[in-house]
Each structure stands twice: as C-alpha cells, then as structure tokens.
C-alpha cells in the first residue's frame, strides 16, 4: 500500500506523523465541497525535502491549495509544467520554501516540498469538489482512512494527532435520512441544513468514514 501524507525524501522515506487533521465539507445532492487541513511537525536536525501524497477520488477536482512551512505561506498558483519546475528549483537554490504539485495517478496527487528546516510546523490545506453519485436513492460520501491514518506505535509512539470531521448537508427537505455505518454521529439542524459531527473524539481513522444520505430526488453530476 502506498504511503500517504508527508514523506521525507532524504530521511530514509520515513513519514512525518500528523498533529492535526480537520475535514470540513458542504454537501448537496450532487456535489461535495471539501476542505482538508493537515498539520505536521518536523523534528529532525537538518534541512530536508519531502513529498506529500494526497488520495483523491476520480470524481474530484482540486480547487484550492495552501501550504505553510514555518512562517512561510505559499498559495497555489497554476503554471505550465516546465515553468513550474524551473520556479521550484530556483526557490530551492535560493534557500526559500517552495512546492511543486504533480498529479501522478487518477486517485492521488503528489506535492514536492523543499527546504524544510528542523523543528518546523508544516500545514497543508487542500480544497476540492467531488461528484456525489446516487444508487437506489442513496448517496454515499467517504473520507478515506489515509487522510488520518494510525501510525505504528514502535515508530512514532501512541498517536497524538487530533481528528475533526464536520459536514453540512444542504436541501434538508429533500432528505429522508442520514446515517453512518462506520462512525457514531451527532446532528443539529438550522433552516434547511443538517450539520453533522463525530459524536465522540477520535485520534485517527481505523476505517473509512462513510456517510449515507437517503433521498427521493433525481441527482445530476456537476463535474463532467
């Protein structure tokens, strides 16, 4: 299985453990608008480069990317591939923090991160939209385990990161039921919205987070 998350290139491919994971999603009956925030902390004793691998559904498209390495904040900017590589290498030579986004599979994309100093906090926020597909009047939305994995205790000690999953479902009047076969939920309601959070605190996903939305309405996919 591929390792997702932050992988240190010049440190024997070890993975930098997570500190915080937040998933914030707004769903209607055809589209999910999702933001994922992940924070890492590099405790090494020398500057390193790293790659960050993020799982992505074939039905999804990235819309926003924001990376903060220490006090340096880098916002995503679309460039032609050759220009982007030159820009990345130029900043690395200058000693500046930089990143290069490179999609390498249908279900995953990869970001190269450069010049990460010791005792540095790295935060990554990714926004994406995803088609929601309906089968027998049920929409199933999933947050994969790889967003917030459990690390082996002998490598990192007991998991210390914090996980939050917050979901808002629009068009409440078209929905008959919402449930999760994977995790206990708590619900609140406001106007025509359903707001959902995990009902108990967890530190990692030992299984995919699955949300089933039951409805009686025709659904049209937005992303073509």
Language model: regions and residue ranges:
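Subset of Sec-pathway N-terminal targeting signals
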Residues: 1-224
